[in-house]
């Protein structure tokens, strides 16, 4: 099935009865980055584990991604609990397009969020990569400590510490 890649009416799949009962799980979140090695170092320092690396190209990659001449380095990382994965892409061809980092209130991909045992420790690790909070750490109803920071390539990352645990 193909169509206009820039348009998918919100809710149209549900209104048409498509995929209502199909089992689904989140596979990963894909993020295009400027420097895959620096980004891997950032996320592994936060506790994620690299579970695969490859360089992709060829007709299958062009078709799947929708870019002619697609050639990229990729890495898949998983969270320690095994429930979350991110896939990082560093494009070799076509050239990566630099954009301004997104703001929290912009429509589209917003952020990637991680639960951490100790937010201060996580922020110390992030600082080693030159990544700092946008405004500081907030406490939400004595339940969570939360913060947003800019990761490598301007990725908006949320860290959350559950204050109700131990």
Residue ranges and their predicted role:
Residues 99-106:
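Non-DNA-binding regulatory cores of transcription-related proteins
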Residues 23-27:
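Extreme N-terminal starter segment of soluble prokaryotic enzymes
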Residues 7-9, 18-22, 53-55, 76, ...:
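Vicinal oxygen chelate
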Residues 29, 112:
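Hydrophobic adenine-recognition pocket in adenosine-nucleotide-binding enzymes
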Residues 92-94:
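Short, solvent-exposed aromatic-acidic interface loops
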Residues 32-83, 128, 147-150:
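Core segments of cupin and vicinal oxygen chelate
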Residues 58-62, 96-99, 140:
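A cross-kingdom feature marking solvent-exposed beta-strand/loop segments within repeated
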